[in-house]
Amino acid sequence: MNLHEYQAKSLFAEYGLPVSEGFACDTAQEAVEAAGHIGGDMWVVKCQVHAGGRGKAGGVKVTGDKNEIRAFAEHWLGKNLVTYQTDEKGQPVAKILVESCTDIANELYLGAVVDRASRRVVFMASTEGGVEIETVAEETPELIHKAIIDPLAGPQPYQARDLGFKLGLNPTQLKQFTKVFMGLAKMFEDHDFALLEINPLVITDEGNIHCLDGKIGIDGNALYRQPKIREMHDPSQDDAREAHAAKFELNYVALDGNVGCMVNGAGLAMGTMDIVNLHGGKPANFLDVGGGATKERVAEAFKIILSDDNVKAVLVNIFGGIVRCDMIAEGIIGAVKEVGVTVPVVVRLEGTNADLGREVLANSDLDIIAATSLTDAAEQVVKAAEGK
């Protein structure tokens, strides 16, 4: 689950971190009034969506004219913002963040992730602020400095100072940076973050550290113990198919191919997508139906997959462990009949009663292709998607 920038900055403020005064507004009039409440003669107005690249897409504006604030809000509220991180439809803009304008002398980067390789929370800092960290990692990895947090000892001030020295901060800025670092580390643990980014973390003209942006991703598995964070969820930013799948405990991620994939087990699902690619196809989705491939769940999975108009064929790859393959085959047949599937369906079954399962499919009188192996399944579904 992701948070909006205004929500992230609200959490920053709770932990005593330096952020700009700002208000999230639902209407153009509120945006104008917010600028008046903030005061000053320059403001920043930003569309609030769960995507980066807003500035290049026209979703951020610096202005000293309240009429321009009104025009900006009227233009974007209720519309979709398309950036390089969204699909072609973009993300809906329901709020505009109005903030005081901050003078920038230098831009830095500070972020943290749960690193699977080290099995630790890892903080990253760089002098290349305002640039996508992935770009920095690819082009100039030596400019990314890391601090690995020991889960027993916790974050230490010396780690912040070490990063600060590498960023070229002066003694006053080091103290401020240490406060930001320690606050973010505590926030990361308190709220079960999976990702945290401040890009850019700026040094103002007065020489002070300031959090100019905020990006937060929450570990979805921990939301049950984060009631406050759950209330911040904005369902309008979710993919409609992914949200529907979650209601049925299906793990679905939309992709841009034409081969629908339905698999039980995340590892097998990724392997299935790989072999479809290997044989010249493009997966339209990742979909893990989990351990219980029942008729009801398979039917919902078909509905979700086929709601994508790009899908020209579906590959069902099921390993029957606890659930017998003949029962799975009957569930697939029932689901195909219930949903009224019109595209070719290729099914590969392995595991308990696999031969019986394939026999059940063959005797179904439905347009279901029973594959003999995963390679055969991939070849068959790619041909079917191409209309061959």
From Swiss-Prot:
Q: What class of enzyme is it?
A: ligase
The record's subunit annotation is:
Heterotetramer of two alpha and two beta subunits.
Q: Which residues bind ATP?
A: 46, 53-55, 99, 102, 107
Instruction: State the protein's name.
Output: Succinate--CoA ligase [ADP-forming] subunit beta
Q: Write out the GO biological process terms.
A: succinyl-CoA metabolic process; tricarboxylic acid cycle
SUPFAM superfamilies in UniProt: Glutathione synthetase ATP-binding domain-like (SSF56059), Succinyl-CoA synthetase domains (SSF52210)
Pathway this chain belongs to: Carbohydrate metabolism; tricarboxylic acid cycle; succinate from succinyl-CoA (ligase route): step 1/1
Q: In Gene Ontology terms, what is one molecular function of this protein?
A: ATP binding
Which EC numbers does the record give?
Answer: 6.2.1.5
Q: Pfam families given for it?
A: ATP-grasp_2, Ligase_CoA
Substrates-to-products reaction catalysed: succinate + ATP + CoA = succinyl-CoA + ADP + phosphate; GTP + succinate + CoA = succinyl-CoA + GDP + phosphate
Annotated substrate binding lies at 264, 321-323
The entry's cellular-component GO terms read: cytosol; succinate-CoA ligase complex
Q: Which residues bind Mg(2+)?
A: 199, 213
Organism of origin is: Shewanella woodyi (strain ATCC 51908 / MS32)
Q: Which of UniProt's keywords are assigned here?
A: ATP-binding, Ligase, Magnesium, Metal-binding, Nucleotide-binding, Tricarboxylic acid cycle
Cofactor needs: Mg(2+)
Where does the ATP-grasp domain lie? 9-244
- Role summary: Succinyl-CoA synthetase functions in the citric acid cycle (TCA), coupling the hydrolysis of succinyl-CoA to the synthesis of either ATP or GTP and thus represents the only step of substrate-level phosphorylation in the TCA. The beta subunit provides nucleotide specificity of the enzyme and binds the substrate succinate, while the binding sites for coenzyme A and phosphate are found in the alpha subunit.
User: How many cofactors are bound and how?
Assistant: Binds 1 Mg(2+) ion per subunit.
Q: Does the keyword Transport apply?
A: no
